[in-house]
């Protein structure tokens, strides 16, 4: 485990500038290693509490069923018991996995896996599409933050610079309704339908050229689950809807859910985060990173000089984007730039565009 975590624990020092504000130099570790251990303990305690609570409810429901006098009453209580049993199994599945975050050697990867690559899907996009130019659009208000997570980050503009840009582990083909490769080059499913194993594309890099690694997906959860951000929904979501993430090597990892689901590879496509960008991460994260956009795996990025506070935000196509020749991305992302100008009145936007 220490081999994977050491890089996150080294103190770093530098200065950054954002939207004309200078933030003082910091010198601190991220706290990642302690977080992983503490969060595993927290989840173990929480699961134990949930099981105790469900067992108590089960006793009450069984008594209620025995005391039921009508078929309708028995049917209702039986349905409640069925739902409770399902929840108990979900929690037991998680207890059996022992940890929320795990670090293992590649030799511990299950050998019976059948790997898929989705390369039999047809291309997406039109080969006749020409690249170049600027796509102009407008927003009515300037976002209160450009942070990806934390307080006020879930604004109407986040989709334009994050959700519609960042790449997932796999894509879902609009015609075949099958998975195709994205950040992951190959994937495999566990027999119980709860876990997806991923092999990252060795070519996958962030927009600053840094390689994407398995541990980045653990780090992506760390920055969302730590006490340094205000994100109650995300914290509750990942706590309840995910069971485990295991790193086997720099390019291989798995994600498990508490129970089997359809479209499993989409549900297990957890967010990644570039650790080198968050080496100032700490209690003042939301203020320090207020106007900073992290390196992306997608085709567009926001340069600091293209943030005109109160006026506009411009995305630029990543030079030498790692997926520019990818079968499923080569004919998309054609504009050189995407510019969003603040125009409060729709009628004015109609005149301009």
Regions found by a protein language model. Give the residues of each.
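N-terminal lobe/hinge region of extracytoplasmic solute-binding protein
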Residues: 117-121, 133-189, 222, 295
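Surface-exposed binding/hinge segments that line
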Residues: 22-23, 127-130, 234-283, 288-290, ...
């Amino acid at each position: 485990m220490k081999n994977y975590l050491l890089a996150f624990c080294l103190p770093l020092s530098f200065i950054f500038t954002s939207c004309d504000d200078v933030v003082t130099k910091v010198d601190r570790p991220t706290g990642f290693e302690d977080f992983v251990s503490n969060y595993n303990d927290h989840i173990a305690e929480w699961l134990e509490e949930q099981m105790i609570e469900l067992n108590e409810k089960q006793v009450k429901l069984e008594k209620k069923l025995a005391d039921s006098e009508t078929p309708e009453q028995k049917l209702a209580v039986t349905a409640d018991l069925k739902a409770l049993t399902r929840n108990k199994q979900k929690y037991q599945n998680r207890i059996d996995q022992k940890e929320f975050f795990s670090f293992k050697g590649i030799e511990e990867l299950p050998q019976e896996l059948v790997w898929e690559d989705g390369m039999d899907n047809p291309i997406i996009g039109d080969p006749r599409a020409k690249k170049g130019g600027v796509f102009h659009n407008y927003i009515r208000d300037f976002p209160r933050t450009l942070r990806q997570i934390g307080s006020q980050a879930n604004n109407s503009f986040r989709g334009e610079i994050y959700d519609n840009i960042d790449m997932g582990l796999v894509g879902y083909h609009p015609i075949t309704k099958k998975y195709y490769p994205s950040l992951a080059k190959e994937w495999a499913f566990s027999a119980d339908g709860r876990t997806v194993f991923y092999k990252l594309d060795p070519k996958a890099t962030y927009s600053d050229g840094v390689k994407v690694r398995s541990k980045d997906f653990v780090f992506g959860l760390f920055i969302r689950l730590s006490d340094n951000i205000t994100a109650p929904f995300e914290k509750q979501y990942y706590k309840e809807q995910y069971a485990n993430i295991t790193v086997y090597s720099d390019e291989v990892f798995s994600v498990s859910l508490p129970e089997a689901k359809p479209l499993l590879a989409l549900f297990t496509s957890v967010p990644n985060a570039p650790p080198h960008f968050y080496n100032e991460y700490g209690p003042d994260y939301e203020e320090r990173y207020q106007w900073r956009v992290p390196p992306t795996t997608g085709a567009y990025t926001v340069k600091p000089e293209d943030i005109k506070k109160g006026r506009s935000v411009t995305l630029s196509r990543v030079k030498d984007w790692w997926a520019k020749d990818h079968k499923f991305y080569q004919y998309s992302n054609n504009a050189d730039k995407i510019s969003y100008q603040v125009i409060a009145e729709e009628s004015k936007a109609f005149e301009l565009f």
